[in-house]
Amino acid sequence: MTAALSRICSLTPRSLAAGLRISLLIAAFTASSTCGALIYETTSPYHHIRVVDDHGIRTLYFDNAAESSMSLSNNAGGHFEYTEYFHMPWLWNTQICEVLMIGLGGGSTQHAFEHYYPDVSFRTIEIDPAVARVARDYFTVRESDKQKVEISDGRVFLRRSRAKYDLIILDAYLSGRYGSSIPQHLATKEFFELARDHLTANGVLVYNVAGTVSGWHSDIVGAMYRTLGVVFPQVYLFPVTTSMNVVLLATCSPVRANLDGVRWRAAQMTQARRITIPGFRQRVEAFRSAAPANASRCPILTDDFAPVEGLSGGYGNPDRTRSP
């Protein structure tokens, strides 16, 4: 915060006003993260972790960023809206049986898949043992025949595994000097090639990116879109309407989708009760097939060059709105 204020001192009056508004927003985000009753707190090699209860909602914080939330009365509710876009792959692959997720957090997605798709096998890779303990002790995450949690780095796991998945979900962030950002080694062309090799013929990969299509942190969204496009035949975007997140969806299928087709599939799947998550057809309206306007000038991220933290700037604590 001190560095931010010192930069503001050198700005013009108009820029100063804008900078002060940004500083006030940052302060508001930080203040909001301390509301409610602190239930648990610890520090791991990766995060300062807190669990906070407020008005029937339990929220997991990494540093000052709200990472996951859960209704205390229904562990499949109270989640952030962006996680609902992790259900979109069913519109491209109606036979999802095996799912791999990198990043556990408070287990919002794990709870949702367990609730809505009880026959799906779901394996989660989480690098931080402290996060896995918190998810178990405070967010009711339980292992079963269909739900498995393994402590490992996601890329290392894929390199050592021979398993194939119908869906791979990525929602992993690390804390850095400027806030939280996507782990560099999970954002490169080489990583996506590795992930693609672990997908089935009609497999789908989805990736939560903290940013917007145009404006706040749009460069990291553009770079991720462009990098995925080097590896996968088709890439789509779902900008989240209530928070600063974009969910990218990449398919192994070369068939290009459009909004009308996606709407039709969503109608078929919901009418057949294959998808019963509330508001699913409304979420479909966020679908975008066009590349972000800035994508062509954003870098293709590689193991040799992946300035992820610089492109995203560290997201701090963006405003994420819960879904019922």
Model regions: which residues?
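Sec-dependent signal peptide recognition
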Residues: R7, A17-L25
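Extended Gly/Ser/Thr-rich low-complexity repeat segments
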Residues: L72-A76
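Soluble small-group transferase modules, centered on the S-adenosyl donor enzyme superfamily
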Residues: C35-T59, D63-S68, Y236-P324
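Acidic/histidine-rich, surface-exposed loop or edge segments in extracytoplasmic proteins
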Residues: D63-S71, L205-N208
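The AdoMet/dcAdoMet-binding core of the Class I SAM-like
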Residues: G77-Y207, S214-M224, V231
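N-terminal signal peptide c-region/cleavage motif recognized by signal peptidases
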Residues: A31-S32
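N-terminal secretory signal peptides that target proteins for export/translocation
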Residues: M1-S15
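Histidine- and/or cysteine-centered catalytic micro-motif in compact active-site loops
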Residues: Y173, A210-T212, V240, S253
